[in-house]
């Protein structure tokens, strides 16, 4: 499964077109349930708004959008396309419109929804997501420093060691790269090291 980019947390951006206010909220959402929770929260915070247009793209390929009463293809579709052009996934963008009394026409609506969604995504912090595994191993105090060097020399994110009757080392690394590291640790400990490896998961790395 391929690495991908998403955003961290939530970002907002406001765009105005002929007195209509377009307030875009972009948020991380890696499931449909989380995406809809963001949508419902934005709706609840903007009960007097005319429209709450949204689109989301999940890493698994699932997408969804809504014009929420705007003319077809003038609102939800531009928001969805903006997410696609940004090259991100596991993202929902909700654009709340407060009507300003002047009709914008189809071209004006497309421009406004695109600008609002694009602004929110540009404000967001991008994060690279990789398929990773979390690993841990217990080694003796005599083996600790060399084991730590072996782990640190690989592409890993190494946590602080935990000291008790032995030393526990925990780290995160890209899935599929753990085999060589396990071999090196087994050689160091003469087969005494039992590396625990989690199921692969997507995480910032």
Question: Where in the sequence are the language-model features?
Answer:
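C-terminal regulatory domains involved in ligand/effector binding and gene-expression control
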Residues: 1-74, 183, 196-205
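Positively charged, aromatic-enriched nucleic acid-contacting surfaces
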Residues: 61, 71-88, 163
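Active-site beta-strand/loop microenvironment that shapes enzyme catalytic pockets
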Residues: 78-123
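Short glycine-/aliphatic-rich beta-strand segments at the starts of folded cytosolic domains
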Residues: 125-143, 169-171
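Short amphipathic alpha-helix segments
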Residues: 138-156
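Short amphipathic alpha-helices in soluble, non-transmembrane regions
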Residues: 148-153, 180-189
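Conserved short beta-strand edge segments in small beta-sheet-based binding/regulatory domains
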Residues: 158-162, 189-205
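Terminal, non-globular segments
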Residues: 171-180
């Amino acid at each position: 499964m391929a690495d991908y980019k998403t955003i961290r947390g939530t970002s907002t951006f406001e765009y105005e077109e002929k007195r209509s206010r377009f307030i875009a909220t972009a948020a991380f959402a890696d499931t449909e349930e989380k995406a809809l929770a963001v949508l419902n929260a934005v709706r609840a915070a903007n009960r007097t708004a005319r429209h709450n247009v949204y689109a989301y793209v999940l890493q698994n390929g699932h997408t969804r959008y809504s014009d929420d009463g705007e003319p077809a293809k003038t609102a939800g579709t531009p928001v969805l396309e903006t997410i696609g052009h940004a090259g991100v996934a596991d993202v929902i963008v909700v654009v709340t419109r407060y009507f300003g009394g002047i009709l914008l026409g189809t071209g004006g609506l497309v421009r406004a929804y695109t600008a609002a969604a694009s602004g929110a995504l540009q404000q967001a912090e991008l994060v690279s997501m990789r398929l990773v595994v979390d690993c841990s191993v217990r080694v003796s105090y005599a083996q600790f420093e060399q084991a730590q060097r072996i782990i640190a020399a690989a592409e890993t994110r190494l946590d602080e060691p935990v000291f008790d009757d032995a030393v526990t080392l925990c780290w995160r690394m890209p899935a599929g790269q753990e085999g060589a590291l396990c071999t090196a640790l087994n050689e160091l400990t003469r087969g005494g090291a039992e590396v625990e490896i989690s199921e692969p998961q997507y995480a910032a790395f």
